[in-house]
Structure formats: structure tokens, C-alpha cells
């Protein structure tokens, strides 16, 4: 099983340092590029091919009629061998009108960074976008993850790790609760805060909405196991996958 976990550690430190220089209000408005991956296993499509036409149709459609109310859409176009599957997910506090700008940015960013790739993923601060020639609905992606961490450490690392992990685990249970609904739809997102000594930790967890609640918890459980590798004693950190992610900081980073 391959993974890109940890492959952007240098980028992580630079990105976090830049983010920390912004005010809280500015952070809430940023949509920084974080990472991307172009699939080498799915190959490339030819210009003017049926796959390209299907992809163009889907990408132009999702930016105009996407389900921005809940910040998620999974759609497909075409027939085998030219099937195109596209998924986008906006951050839990970036639904409705806050979602379309991120998706539009992601579409142009993915085209520029992974030209003609049949499979690709791009992450921004407020959304992710995935294109593929392979169906992935309700399937956890275990192969594509990475982390960003604050280069600065807490003084009491042991206590901080224990309490932050407990907060994230609590949020994972809440996000994947089958009774955590918006109407009839699973929310698959939770945010919270906790005081640890003199500091307050703010955190969130989220799954993509193609997952059922049991798959959501399974995904979150998997990335939370990477907390020691990502975030041991760090003042802030996040682990991103395609199917789920978590983040914590010592400052508010979510919209109300």
C-alpha cells in the first residue's frame, strides 16, 4: 500500500508559518492551496477523446449546479471505458455560498497541475476535488494522505497529546453518529474546543458524504492513529485524506 503521508513536511512548516501570521478573521477567508496528487496508475486521456468530453461536462456542471447546501457532490458521466467520476467536498463551515469559489479554484488548479491525468486529487484549505476513471463511492481511500504540522512544540507534550487526542476522538464519534443529521442526511462533520492548562484547543473532523456512518468512523479512526507521526506535541496539526481529515489549532480557524 503506497502513501504520500509525510511527503510534504517541509511545505507543511512553511505553510503553517505563513498561516500563523494572518489574523483569525483573515484565516477564515483564506483558501490556500495545500497539496495535490496526480495518479500514475490511471494513465492519461487524449485531447478530443470521449473521456475528455465527459470530464469537461462534469467539471463545468459542478461549478454551476453543485449541491452547495451541504458542500458535497459525487457524480459520474459516460460509459466504460470512458467513465468519469468526480467528487468534491467543502469544509464543514464552508457550505452554501462559501463553497463555489473554492470548487472553481480547485477545478482550475487541478487542470493546471495534473493536465490530462485520468485520476487526480487536489486539496485546498476549504475544499478538496477528486477526479477518477474508477468508482469510489462509499469506499475509503487509504492510499492518499498527508499532513501539515506547526513546527513549534508545546512545553507539556504528554498532557497536550493525551487531551488533544481525546478531543479528536470525541469529535470522531460525534461526526459519525448515525443520529447526527441535517434533515435526513448524515452530517459527518464535528467541531469543538477544549481547555488544556492555560491554552484552548480548537478542532474539527470531517468525512466525505459518500461514506456511511460506520465507514466514516473507520476512516477517522485510521487517520487519528497517525496523530503521533503528524502532531506529537505540535501546537497545531492536520491530517488529510481523500475520505476524511482532522485539524486542531490553538486559535479559532472555523467560521461560526
Curated annotation (Swiss-Prot):
Q: Where in the cell is it found?
A: Secreted
Q: List the keywords (alphabetical).
A: Repeat, Secreted, Signal
**UniProt domain Gnk2-homologous: residue ranges:** 33-136, 142-253
Coarsely, its chief localization is: secreted
GO cellular component labels? extracellular region
Q: Could you tell me which cysteines form disulfide bridges?
A: none
Q: Would you indicate the residue range of the signal peptide?
A: 1-26
Pfam families recorded:
Stress-antifung
Q: Glycosyltransferase as a keyword? A: no
Q: Which Gene3D superfamilies match?
A: Gnk2 domain, C-X8-C-X2-C motif
Q: What PANTHER family does UniProt report for this protein, alphabetically?
A: CYSTEINE-RICH REPEAT SECRETORY PROTEIN 29-RELATED, CYSTEINE-RICH REPEAT SECRETORY PROTEIN 38-RELATED
Query: Hey, which family's this protein in?
Result: Belongs to the cysteine-rich repeat secretory protein family.
Under what name is this protein listed?
A: Cysteine-rich repeat secretory protein 42
In its UniProt entry, the species of origin is given as Arabidopsis thaliana (Mouse-ear cress)
Amino acid at each position: 500500500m503506497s502513501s504520500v503521508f509525510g511527503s510534504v513536511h517541509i511545505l507543511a512548516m512553511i505553510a503553517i508559518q505563513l498561516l500563523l501570521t494572518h489574523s483569525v478573521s483573515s484565516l477564515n477567508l483564506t483558501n490556500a492551496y495545500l497539496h495535490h496528487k496526480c495518479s500514475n496508475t490511471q494513465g492519461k486521456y487524449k485531447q478530443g477523446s470521449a473521456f475528455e468530453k465527459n470530464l469537461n461536462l462534469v467539471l463545468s456542471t459542478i461549478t454551476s449546479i453543485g449541491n452547495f447546501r451541504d458542500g458535497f457532490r459525487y457524480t459520474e458521466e459516460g460509459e466504460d471505458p470512458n467513465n468519469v467520476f468526480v467528487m468534491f467536498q467543502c469544509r464543514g463551515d464552508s457550505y452554501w455560498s462559501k463553497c463555489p469559489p473554492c470548487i472553481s479554484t480547485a477545478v482550475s488548479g487541478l487542470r493546471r497541475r495534473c493536465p490530462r491525468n485520468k485520476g487526480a486529487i487536489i486539496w485546498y484549505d476549504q475544499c478538496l476535488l477528486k477526479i477518477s476513471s474508477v468508482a469510489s463511492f462509499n469506499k475509503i481511500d487509504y492510499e492518499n494522505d498527508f499532513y501539515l504540522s506547526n513546527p513549534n512544540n508545546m512545553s507539556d507534550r504528554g498532557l497536550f497529546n493525551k487531551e488533544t487526542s481525546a478531543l479528536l476522538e470525541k469529535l470522531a464519534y460525534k461526526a459519525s453518529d448515525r443520529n447526527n443529521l441535517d434533515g435526513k442526511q448524515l452530517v459527518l462533520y464535528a467541531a469543538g474546543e477544549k481547555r488544556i492548562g492555560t491554552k484552548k484547543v480548537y478542532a474539527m473532523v470531517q468525512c466525505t458524504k459518500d461514506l456511511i456512518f460506520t465507514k466514516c468512523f473507520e476512516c477517522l479512526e485510521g487517520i487519528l492513529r497517525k496523530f503521533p507521526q503528524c502532531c506529537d506535541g505540535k501546537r497545531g496539526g492536520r491530517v488529510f485524506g481523500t475520505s476524511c481529515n482532522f485539524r486542531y489549532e490553538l486559535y479559532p480557524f472555523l467560521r461560526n
